[in-house]
């Protein structure tokens, strides 16, 4: 019987068949962790040297070999072999080819369990920084757009029906606040990712006199995990990321859904740049909002990655199980998806053309000023419920007569209630309706300018 030549093969008499090997291998995707695997190994072997577990000479020779591997990796000169299963075994084999049997000492006081957890913490910690940078850029684009459209008036909707006139900037600031909370969630995610699993070993720690604090400091983590079993068993930092990413994608998807509607012939509120639209292969007139639709569509795949990993984790006993190999591809794909989506959404918004006239025109139809008349009557002492009923009858009669509220004469309006006077026509103007809503968080122009100023100040403080 052929001897098992795997680095872990001492206990085995038989060999693994190729098709089984292909099923179990992860190198096709976990090679994304190669840089972090080398960085983690450099910290580990430096710690081994400083604690006397390896001689300083041994530690330095291994570090030289690892640094050479890192240079070759960055130059695209490393080839990985599926026979070596995963990125950890591939890197150890490559190191052995470079420095000989001394490479075998690198794995002293370390398991692949804490090794892969360390790689993934390092990877996600870096990616969270990129996500937050792109979110900050998107929020900046939103603020710039909002600042230019405080006085641009559009219909506000409930149930996709005209509700009340609002400032377009106000609508944009609603999304700004959603994205701000997304940023805060990712920042909290950083806290849980900024923990070092290295030195946890397989699950129970090690008998070697390692210095886990030193390893953590070398890798610039805030602190080591305080329980080794926890360090190698859980992937909640990834689940937290996938959850945050799902909420972010939901917010982007909702925004894209609105832009898809707004650029349609039925709305004509905005025009998307040609850069973010695609034509039809058969209909020459078409300009389709494909990029917005793709963000909306990709939201589902991010949700899927979250539910997939939750399902993997739900019944796993402590500590490590091979099921955890399934934690990576969804994370990698989610990172790529949200980074690209943030770029595309920011690009769409920065090149957006706003049709102010169409927005304004739309507010003058479908009775979005009806609440103004009800508030007007309530402000003159009429109980709001009675005012609501009066205006409801007027709206019904307006529909039957094909009129807008402002089309009725004063004498006609006074037949509905005597409290209505000449000044009602000012109140029925969309601009007045917006301007008067200056309660905290309202759509009044002063309030919107205040919201923008507060947001800009907070953004500047973050820089």
Curated annotation (Swiss-Prot):
Record's GO cellular component, any one?
cytosol
For this protein, the record's Pfam families field holds: ASL_C2, Lyase_1
**Molecular functions (GO terms):** argininosuccinate lyase activity
Question: Which cysteine pairs are covalently linked by disulfides here?
Answer: none
What are the alphabetically sorted keywords of the record?
Answer: Amino-acid biosynthesis, Arginine biosynthesis, Cytoplasm, Lyase
List, alphabetically, the InterPro entries matched. Arg_succ_lyase_C, Argininosuccinate_lyase, Fumarase/histidase_N, Fumarate_lyase_CS, Fumarate_lyase_fam, Fumarate_lyase_N, L-Aspartase-like
Known catalysed reaction(s)? 2-(N(omega)-L-arginino)succinate = fumarate + L-arginine
Q: Which Enzyme Commission number(s) are on file for it?
A: 4.3.2.1
Pathway note: Amino-acid biosynthesis; L-arginine biosynthesis; L-arginine from L-ornithine and carbamoyl phosphate: step 3/3
Has keyword Cell inner membrane?
A: no
Recorded superkingdom: Bacteria
Q: Does the keyword Cytoplasm belong to this entry?
A: yes
The record's Gene Ontology biological-process terms are: arginine biosynthetic process via ornithine; L-arginine biosynthetic process
The protein's matches in CDD domains, at most eight in alphabetical order, are given as: Argininosuccinate_lyase
Family statement: Belongs to the lyase 1 family. Argininosuccinate lyase subfamily.
Q: What is this protein called?
A: Argininosuccinate lyase
- Organism equals Streptococcus pneumoniae serotype 2 (strain D39 / NCTC 7466)
